[in-house]
Amino acid sequence: MLLADPEWLHADAASLWKIIATGILKSGPFDLVLCGRQASDTDGGQVLHWIALYLGIPVVTPVTRIETVDNSNEDGTLTVHRLTEEGTQRVRVKLPAMLGVSSEMNEPRLPPMRGLMNAGRAMIPAWKKADLGVR
């Protein structure tokens, strides 16, 4: 989904988390929400925590690696690695969950030509303020 409205351009963290959380709920059931660990302009790192609190799901940040996904029973879990001051910590988290990913998470790669062509035709829902009903 794409959440885009000119009124949101200069929104503060308290407004942004409500907008994003509303969009997540509107999009339907989910198991995992991935987001950056912090905004590049404010370096705040608080929006993802507010979203997770509102959604009632655990949050782990900054994640450098997703090790395993276990959906063998009703309560699925993820095992992830997160950065700490002492190094790296291995954490198991119950799904649904939110992960704040670190720049160390992945080395970007180029998709095959077919993937690029399919991406160009993909329909991504774009929602504005009126679509979400947020103030």
Task: Identify what each model region corresponds to.
Residues 1-135:
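N-terminal glycine-rich FAD/FM-binding segment characteristic of electron-transfer flavoproteins
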